Design a protein with these regions (language model features):
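N-proximal low-complexity "stem/linker" segments adjacent to membrane-targeting elements
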Residues: 1-36
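A short, glycine-/small-residue-rich helix N-cap motif at loop->alpha-helix starts
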Residues: 40-45, 165-166
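Active-site nucleotide-sugar/metal-binding loop of Leloir-type enzymes
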Residues: 47-61
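Short, high-confidence coil segments that cap the C-terminus of an alpha-helix
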Residues: 58-59, 86-88, 181
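Short beta-strand-to-loop acidic/aromatic patch adjacent to the donor-nucleotide binding site
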Residues: 59-70
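Conserved catalytic core of nucleotide-sugar-dependent glycosyltransferases
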Residues: 72-152
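C-terminal catalytic/acceptor-binding lobe
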Residues: 136-247
Length: 247
């Protein structure tokens, strides 16, 4: 077993997060390597490190850690245990979205994520065979709505002149969900850091002020009574071509 740590930084990262990643790797005890992205936009920062990790034939699991995560002690061992014991192909830890605040994962009643951030996510190497390249893309905005006890998932194609942030993680997770190999939700949560005050460069005593969010104030779920059809994709002919879902 070898862990490929994928850090999709666009140029900055909290030193505490790096410290926690190394702590977790040492505690887990498996072989590992870290793959970096520097000064690349979304989704390139995700695709670059994914390609690097998969190019190493010894890497068995890709651990995505975004640059602002708060990793509790034992999180890597805990999530790897869940992945192996349950035979999952991917597992994600929920964490608070600081601007809301709320959790970052929508899950079905069986614990599968159909809408998920990837701040702390482990993906088995074999899971990527269910997706076509590019594995990460941000040209689709997803709109979720409840319609007659169905979750309607409607894509909106992003035009070149539109301003959009993210969605690469949503498309990645939703593609796996529709393939029947969803990202499962870990029972252990992470936190998120945010820089609230930049240290004054004119004083040695002026350090950066960083706030940590660790409480999930809102659990996002979608449940129906005795209905196995938990998700329904809107009827768009070219949807598979646009999100690269393979049969």
């Amino acid at each position: 077993m070898k862990i490929g740590v994928c850090i999709p930084s666009r140029g900055t990262i909290y030193s505490q997060t790096v410290d926690e990643v190394i702590r977790e790797l040492k505690y887990f005890g498996a072989d590992w390597d870290i793959f970096w992205s520097h000064a690349n936009p979304i989704p390139d920062c995700f695709n670059i490190i994914t390609d690097q990790a998969l190019a190493d034939n010894e890497v068995t699991h890709l651990w995505y850690v975004e640059e602002d995560m708060v990793l509790p002690k034992g999180i890597l061992k805990h999530m790897m245990g869940e992945l192996v014991e349950n035979g999952w192909g991917a597992v994600a830890s929920d964490y608070p979205l600081t601007q809301a605040p709320s959790s970052t994962i929508y899950r079905d009643p069986y614990g599968a994520a159909y809408f998920s951030g990837c701040g702390c996510t482990i993906v088995k190497r074999e899971t990527f065979k269910y997706l076509n390249k590019p594995y990460w893309r941000s040209d689709i905005r997803w709109n979720l709505d409840l319609e007659h006890d169905y979750l309607s998932v409607k894509p909106e194609w992003i035009k070149n002149n539109q301003s959009v942030y993210g969605f690469q993680d949503i498309t990645f997770g939703l593609s796996l969900y529709l393939q029947g190999h969803p990202i499962m939700v870990s029972s252990m949560n992470c936190g998120q850091r945010i820089l609230t005050h930049v240290g004054n460069k004119e004083s040695n005593n002026a350090h950066h002020v960083i706030k940590e969010y660790n409480d999930l104030t809102e659990l996002k779920t979608f449940s129906v009574d005795n209905n196995p059809n938990l998700i329904e994709l809107c009827n768009i002919d070219d949807i598979q071509d646009r999100i690269h879902v393979t049969q």
